[in-house]
Amino acid sequence: MKLTPKELDKLMLHYAGRLAEEALARGVKLNYTEAVALISGRVMEKARDGNKSVADLMQEGRTWLKKENVMDGVASMIHEVGIEANFPDGTKLVTIHTPVEDNGKLAPGEVFLKNEDITINAGKEAISLKVKNKGDRPVQVGSHFHFFEVNKLLDFDRAKSFCKRLDIASGTAVRFEPGEEKSVELIDIGGNKRIYGFNSLVDRQADADGKKLGLKRAKEKGFGSVNCGCEATKDKQ
């Protein structure tokens, strides 16, 4: 049996979830890892059964664990659990917010921040692009995803988004509802600008030749409008 790295990760997560289920059945309070594994494992199983929608699991997932089921401080550490699950009609992201009720106590390792604004991506020039979701499902794009290669049903000027990512905090995301149109800010991807993976539109150095190749592949694979006429304006210092 040969498994892909992604399949191995899911198998490991499923195994961890089973161990957490056994611990919970014995009355053992779960730690952070066990709680996340249990919730993720149940989501994957119920999604595979095909009897629940994403919305159903997002709601039901908040009922599986209570504060008395986890160790002190764990509830406040789990802000959300996101898992890509296989439904009968494809893979979908299920995000469960505040899956465990907070007990109100101080969390282990809690950080108290100063009451000051935090500047992200300081010194990076940004452009603004109008983006429209022409699909019938929400699309969520993470902070460091190569925006040029996002879902093909997002319509925008792909050429202007080459080698760029969202100008948002690391680990966060922007969500586009079906039919929604809004502007987003993009900044250059840092590092050596060698872009691999995502939707395999580049898979090389993101230079002029890489951009030309990427645009060609995007057009061939039907990635929205390669040039939809959206205007980009440099409006951030």
Curated annotation (Swiss-Prot):
Q: Which InterPro entries match?
A: Urease_beta-like, Urease_betasu_sf, Urease_gamma-beta_su, Urease_gamma/gamma-beta_su, Urease_gamma_sf, Urease_subunit
Picking any one GO molecular function of the record gives:
urease activity
Region annotation Urease beta: where it falls in the sequence:
103-237
* Record-linked CDD domains: Urease_beta (cd00407), Urease_gamma (cd00390)
Q: Which reaction does it catalyse?
A: urea + 2 H2O + H(+) = hydrogencarbonate + 2 NH4(+)
Alphabetical UniProt keywords: Cytoplasm, Hydrolase
* A single GO BP: urea catabolic process
Q: Name one Pfam family in it.
A: Urease_beta
Tell me where it mainly resides: cytoplasm
Q: Which GO terms describe its cellular component?
A: urease complex
Give the subcellular location: Cytoplasm
Pathway, per record:
Nitrogen metabolism; urea degradation; CO(2) and NH(3) from urea (urease route): step 1/1
Can you state the subunit structure given in the record? Answer: Heterohexamer of 3 UreA (alpha) and 3 UreB (beta) subunits.
Family to which this protein belongs: In the N-terminal section; belongs to the urease gamma subunit family.
Q: What is this protein called?
A: Urease subunit alpha
Organism the protein comes from: Helicobacter felis
